[in-house]
């Protein structure tokens, strides 16, 4: 299988500390770059299970790796990771898990998927097209306050109220069904003095995260990773914006710090921490950013399970 070299590839491979006979999970197959790297480092007795809720990604995996007995792909969100691991009898035996959060480059580049404000296409944004609600159906029926809340909570968009009002005004004229239409609405609503990057960036991010339950699924997945890992197993999480990274950071802090009240008479050495952070936050090198500008906002956190 030929695969593109994904973001922070070398750092992830080092962070997973891959054992030739180990069991690994790639929770976000995408186009297989990380999975391919793991398989290259596994021996004949090693195993890799990949997951992806995008049927296009599953089709790529089945075509490229169907002959590799060490590999299996599950068409499922990583929010159901523990069940998929349990079905294989691997619970508590997994040596490494990778989560590469967010939208993939192929999804962004395919105008028909509706993720990009720079390519006109149907306003869809579903990672799993079998999911019932797409971006257009939501944006044309949601209350203005609900739109404002989504733009603020998931995009940290300062002008959420203005944009939400502009969306409601525009859809009264005709339904919003194309990515270009939504992008134009946001551009017109944005104060010109504030334009430093494309005005629709945060709006598209927020709607995509909401439609696909991205933060909810990450929140559900992280405790499952802890339960499925073997002691000494590694978890690597790549995030691309502060909302995701904040969620991951708080989970790691909760499972790795002393968080009992000071008045409780227990010594720190007697508290069993479940996770140990390995190093600090990892960012891509300037050389990687030059080759792949999308890598600029990537952040990698690596932890090891202690108990």
UniProtKB/Swiss-Prot annotation:
<dbReference type="InterPro" id="IPR023397">
    <property type="entry name" value="SAM-dep_MeTrfase_MraW_recog"/>
</dbReference>
<keyword id="KW-0808">Transferase</keyword>
<keyword id="KW-0489">Methyltransferase</keyword>
<keyword id="KW-0963">Cytoplasm</keyword>
<protein>
    <recommendedName>
        <fullName>Ribosomal RNA small subunit methyltransferase H</fullName>
        <ecNumber>2.1.1.199</ecNumber>
    </recommendedName>
</protein>
<feature type="binding site">
    <location>
        <position position="52"/>
    </location>
    <ligand>
        <name>S-adenosyl-L-methionine</name>
    </ligand>
</feature>
<feature type="binding site">
    <location>
        <begin position="32"/>
        <end position="34"/>
    </location>
    <ligand>
        <name>S-adenosyl-L-methionine</name>
    </ligand>
</feature>
<keyword id="KW-0698">rRNA processing</keyword>
<dbReference type="GO" id="GO:0005737">
    <property type="term" value="C:cytoplasm"/>
</dbReference>
<feature type="binding site">
    <location>
        <position position="78"/>
    </location>
    <ligand>
        <name>S-adenosyl-L-methionine</name>
    </ligand>
</feature>
<feature type="binding site">
    <location>
        <position position="107"/>
    </location>
    <ligand>
        <name>S-adenosyl-L-methionine</name>
    </ligand>
</feature>
<dbReference type="Pfam" id="PF01795">
    <property type="entry name" value="Methyltransf_5"/>
</dbReference>
<dbReference type="InterPro" id="IPR002903">
    <property type="entry name" value="RsmH"/>
</dbReference>
<comment type="function">
    <text>Specifically methylates the N4 position of cytidine in position 1402 (C1402) of 16S rRNA.</text>
</comment>
<dbReference type="InterPro" id="IPR029063">
    <property type="entry name" value="SAM-dependent_MTases_sf"/>
</dbReference>
<keyword id="KW-0949">S-adenosyl-L-methionine</keyword>
<dbReference type="GO" id="GO:0071424">
    <property type="term" value="F:rRNA (cytosine-N4-)-methyltransferase activity"/>
</dbReference>
<dbReference type="GO" id="GO:0070475">
    <property type="term" value="P:rRNA base methylation"/>
</dbReference>
<comment type="similarity">
    <text>Belongs to the methyltransferase superfamily. RsmH family.</text>
</comment>
<feature type="binding site">
    <location>
        <position position="100"/>
    </location>
    <ligand>
        <name>S-adenosyl-L-methionine</name>
    </ligand>
</feature>
């Amino acid at each position: 299988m030929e695969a593109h070299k994904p973001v922070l590839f070398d750092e992830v491979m080092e962070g997973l500390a891959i054992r030739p006979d180990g069991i690994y999970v790639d929770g976000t197959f995408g186009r297989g770059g990380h999975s391919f790297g793991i398989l290259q480092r596994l021996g004949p007795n090693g195993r890799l299970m990949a997951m992806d809720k995008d049927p296009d990604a599953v089709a790529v995996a089945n075509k490229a790796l169907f002959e590799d007995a060490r590999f299996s792909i599950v068409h499922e969100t990583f929010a159901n990771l523990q069940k998929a691991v349990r079905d294989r009898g691997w619970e508590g035996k997994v040596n490494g898990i990778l989560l590469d959060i967010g939208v993939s480059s192929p999804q962004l580049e395919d105008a028909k998927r509706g993720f990009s404000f720079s390519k006109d296409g149907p306003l869809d944004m579903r990672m799993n097209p079998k999911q019932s609600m797409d971006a257009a159906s939501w944006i044309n029926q949601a209350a203005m306050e609900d739109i404002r809340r989504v733009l603020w909570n998931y995009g940290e968009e300062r002008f959420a109220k203005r944009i939400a009002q502009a969306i409601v005004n525009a859809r009264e004229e005709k339904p919003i069904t194309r990515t270009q239409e939504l992008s134009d609405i946001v551009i017109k609503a944005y104060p010109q003095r504030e334009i430093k990057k494309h005005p629709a960036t945060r709006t598209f991010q927020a709607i995509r995260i909401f439609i696909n339950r991205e933060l909810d699924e990450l929140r559900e997945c992280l405790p499952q990773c802890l339960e499925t890992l073997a002691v000494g197993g590694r978890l690597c999480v790549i995030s691309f914006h502060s909302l995701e990274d904040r969620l991951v950071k708080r989970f790691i802090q909760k499972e790795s710090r002393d968080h009992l009240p000071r008045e409780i008479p227990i010594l720190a050495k007697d508290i069993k921490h479940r996770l140990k952070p390995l190093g600090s936050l990892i960012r891509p090198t300037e050389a990687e950013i030059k080759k792949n500008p999308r890598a600029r906002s990537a952040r990698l956190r690596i932890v090891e399970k202690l108990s």
